[in-house]
């Protein structure tokens, strides 16, 4: 089997083939026959719709559970059987989350041979494919998230990412290739893959039925509740990681792709719901990093470590995690900032002579110059909190001192509002003009900008703000 390969469409079909490459006679004879078009490359019609469906998977994940639900109407649910079904649900569910996912798909920790055998067994009891098939497909999902090479891309629809990718046939050539050398060299993975059908039948149906049958005589109840229905709920929980975790919640670490964090998804999936974190830090054995977040898979792996069954638990440094969080917060702030009116950018303001500024002010235009920037306050005069007389006294003058403490040391909000009224820059060597000229000459000027190219104006860093407040007349 090639080291970098794409998953087959069906876990059972691949296992039935023994996991080996099959070279057909047609492949040995180049150009002997034209290539057959895969059914997924043809449109769905009334005549061929049934060919697009994976009937084996439909039987396993839809038809059999329906049979179980129907039988549950007549089969009484005993308390011991119910408790056993719940316990085995968690056992097989952790076989997927702690075993298939975090151990084999992401190598986020190492396990002793007994633990590997246990996880391979109970993971098989979840009836979600062999370790090799499952982990290979999941690696493709991470490598090609939200693209056509993602085997269960949410971009194809929420229903498709949940169950459609299983019940509809997929062209294996379109699924992204991944590195699986480590899986091919793991004897437990290889053994389970070769004997997968036996593992599924025994661990999925026979074992839970034996426990309830030999334990308290409820053979058929064990078959229906701890077997069929328990498999259905484990599968649906896992499918929620592919669908719900890419649709519901927040994106505190990155929003380039669809993965999201949400407590509801975590509750449904044994802690796999903090998916945005997981896609950013996939080799971390944790999905939840806060003490209050629900992640029983993480807690179980930690307990195994204390028992000597697991070791080399991988964790990203808190510093790197926090950097990602801060960068995403900054990105969200930039998005909000881009929607606000910060006034005409300084570099786009026209440079005007002082005499022109004075003349326009004398001719009835309410212009005020503060720190070399001209502001038109005509429409604001009547709303000025300090009264009309106060603001009128600064029209046509340099009101820098007046605005920054000479009369009143204006608030940060006042500086922000003032920035939306600026209309020009005074010529004459003032600081703002020097800054503006340097911009035109492409000289390096201290100016922090966000990802959209907008200048970031921090509180107290407005161009009209004088660092040291000027002493007021009363204080003098």
From Swiss-Prot:
UniProt short sequence motif Histidine box-1, positions renumbered to this chain: 101-106
Cofactor note: Expected to bind 2 Fe(2+) ions per subunit.
Chain intervals for the UniProt region annotation (Disordered): 1-35
Positions with a binding annotation for Fe cation 1: 101, 106, 138, 142, 278
Catalytic activity: octadecanoyl-CoA + 2 Fe(II)-[cytochrome b5] + O2 + 2 H(+) = (9Z)-octadecenoyl-CoA + 2 Fe(III)-[cytochrome b5] + 2 H2O
Binding site for Fe cation 2: 141, 246, 275, 279
Annotated TM spans: 55-75, 81-101, 111-131, 200-220
Topological region Cytoplasmic: 1-54, 102-110, 221-476
Pfam families: Cyt-b5, FA_desaturase
Keyword set, alphabetical order: Electron transport, Fatty acid biosynthesis, Fatty acid metabolism, Heme, Iron, Lipid biosynthesis, Lipid metabolism, Membrane, Metal-binding, Oxidoreductase, Transmembrane, Transmembrane helix, Transport
Histidine box-2 (motif): residue ranges: 138-142
PANTHER family in UniProt: ACYL-COA DESATURASE, DESATURASE 1, ISOFORM A-RELATED
Family listed: Belongs to the fatty acid desaturase type 1 family.
Domain notes: The histidine box domains are involved in binding the catalytic metal ions.
Name this protein carries in UniProt: Acyl-CoA desaturase
Organism: Ajellomyces capsulatus
Organism phylogeny: Eukaryota, Fungi, Dikarya, Ascomycota, Pezizomycotina
Gene giving rise to this polypeptide: OLE1
